[in-house]
């Protein structure tokens, strides 16, 4: 799976965010972009969607999650600390 990579710092998850959705959810894999497609209810205003992305993935994975790339873009890279690639895949259901 191209959208999940192991690094020295932790596991990198590459996502594509669709803000202002009805609810927060993982939509599946965007094959064209090679990223995990995620719907987020928060609007992309004043960092609200970014905060919601971090909160959503932190709760889902039960680990520390930070945005390391794409603060102002829909394409974001998340760094997950304290989990292996296998654990992340299992918790994401992919």
From Swiss-Prot:
Q: Which SUPFAM superfamilies match?
A: YggU-like
Gene Ontology cellular component annotations, sorted alphabetically: cytoplasm
InterPro entries from the UniProt entry: DUF167 (IPR003746), YggU-like_sf (IPR036591)
Q: Which SMART domains does the annotation name?
A: DUF167
- Note the superkingdom of the native organism: Archaea
Family to which this protein belongs:
Belongs to the UPF0235 family.
Alphabetized HAMAP family for the sequence: UPF0235
For this protein, the record's PANTHER family field holds: UPF0235 PROTEIN C15ORF40
Protein's UniProt name: UPF0235 protein TK0768
What organism does this protein naturally occur in? Answer: Thermococcus kodakarensis (strain ATCC BAA-918 / JCM 12380 / KOD1)
